[in-house]
Amino acid sequence: MRYAPTVLRARTLSIWFAAITVMASGSALAEEVLSDEPADTLKYVVGLAATSSSNYPGSANNEFKLRPLWALQYGRLRISTSRAGGFMSNASETVNPGASAELIRHDRLKIGAGLRIDGGRSPSDDPLLASLPEIRRTLRARVYASYAITEQWGVSTGITQDLLGREGGATALMDTSYRTRLSPQTELLLGGGLSFGNGKYMNSYFGVPQASSLQSGLPAYQPGAGIRDVHAAIGLTTHLSDRWIIFGELNLSRLLGDAASSPLTQKSSNVGGSIGLAYRCCD
């Protein structure tokens, strides 16, 4: 179903209004829980990273890019690019990109919500996708929670949903992490977990519609909801000074289930990574 532009604009504005309201109320709640924290201050991170990642999930090819890193945080409100948000504190964290608000932070538990732009997928991303429909850019909402089992071990989970009805569907993940200091300046982070997609997400990213099958020669394919991949990462972060940080990360993932069986999956396993330099201010 296609929406008229005015209806879509109204819907988008209402989504943003609701999200801002949730973030604001969540910040107030967090202030009640953490009333002994110091006054809110503005923090930021800027930097640059070289990254390697697959053209799309299941692609046989990796693309290399230079990406800017930036993040802004005021109290429990944060907006950041991928990876940058984790450098706001002396102990690196796993922080998803986009805008987020920490709604509850009590002892070892954190609960939050956020928004991010999902870039979708273009037929031009890979020759194999040329006859497939575009997956349009959309806005995703995310709810997440993490729990520190010990100072070193932690678990986290999150759910995302396409808010604009652009066939992005819903995703979920469950992760565990281990972090330890190799020296006063250097921290090692190990992590791994599973990701899942509902039927709409899996069909958009791993399905082949009948019409596209006739054009591309690929067999028609309609995956069901379920597990998408298993993934792991190892990362090192070194503080060169109070402000400057250098980091590197190696990522491994393997598609499973219907995602691995898709005609679009040229390679079920992928190795990627990043290395970069960032400047952080001000504690």
Regions found by a protein language model. Name each.
Residues M1-T41, D283:
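Cleavable N-terminal export/targeting peptides
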Residues L29-I79, G85-F87, R108-K110, R121:
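Short glycine/proline- and aromatic-enriched beta-strand/turn motifs that initiate or cap beta-hairpins
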Residues E31-V33, D162-A260, L264-Q266, C281-D283:
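Outer-membrane beta-barrel transmembrane domain signature
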Residues L42, N62-P68, D107, I135-A141, ...:
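Residues that define the transmembrane beta-barrel architecture of outer-membrane proteins
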Residues Y44, R76-S80, L109, E151-V155, ...:
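Repeated loop/turn-to-beta-strand initiation elements of outer-membrane beta-barrel proteins
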Residues V46-L48, W70, T81, I111-L115, ...:
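Membrane-embedded beta-strand positions of outer-membrane beta-barrel proteins
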Residues A50-S54, Y74-R76, G85-F87, L115-R121, ...:
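Transmembrane beta-strands of outer-membrane beta-barrel pores
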Residues R67-L69, Q73-G75, T176, S268-D283:
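Outer-membrane beta-barrel "beta-signal"
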